[in-house]
A protein has these predicted regions:
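A short, proline-enriched helix->beta-strand linker immediately N-terminal to the Walker B motif
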Residues: 52-56
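A short, surface-exposed alpha-helical micro-motif characterized by mixed small hydrophobic
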Residues: 100-102
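Conserved ABC ATPase "signature" region
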Residues: 8-28, 137-138
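Conserved ABC ATPase signature
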Residues: 32-37, 41
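ABC ATPase "signature
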Residues: 118-119, 127
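Helical segment within the ABC ATPase nucleotide-binding domain
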Residues: 73-86, 98
Length: 151
């Protein structure tokens, strides 16, 4: 931590951040090794570590990968809360377009390391211009409504 805090003050601040990311028993989590934590807990610890210096930008690279849907939802809610309360910009990197649609105001679509399309999320999702973007969006699983299935 790049501050003038004492060792005890740094520990106290770290435990406060673990509490802010909604980890139960933050004092215990502070003492644990990563292999002793679940995937969701490890993700929260990483978010707490990233937020401890009050950054203006948080880079969230695949923050929900390998997490079950319930924990994904909690991590997404946490990121939204951080964005809203701390006014921290979040660069959300993901292959999960349903999460991108839910979280992002602007979207960059990349292929082979190059940006192929960018713009406001609504524009990208509802009026994609590039064929690659259209194919990605077409691959998003859709819930089949009963009325559609019956007709």
């Amino acid at each position: 931590l790049h501050t003038e805090l004492s060792k005890e003050e740094r520990k106290k601040r770290a435990i406060e951040m673990l509490e802010k990311v909604e980890l139960h028993n933050p004092e215990q989590v502070y003492e644990q090794y990563p292999h002793e934590l679940s995937g969701g807990m490890r993700q929260r610890v990483m978010i707490a570590a990233a937020m401890i210096c009050d950054p203006k930008l948080l880079i969230a690279d695949e923050p929900t990968t390998a997490l079950d849907v319930t924990i994904q939802e909690q991590i997404v809610a946490l990121l939204k809360r951080i964005n809203r309360e701390k006014k921290t910009a979040i660069l959300f990197i993901s292959h999960d377009l349903s999460l991108v649609r839910q979280l992002c105001e602007r979207v960059l679509v990349m292929r082979g390391g190059y940006v192929v399309e960018s713009g406001p999320a609504d524009e990208i999702f509802y009026h994609p211009k590039e064929e690659y973007t259209k194919k990605l969006i077409a691959a998003i699983p859709r819930v089949i409504r009963k009325t559609e299935k019956d007709s």
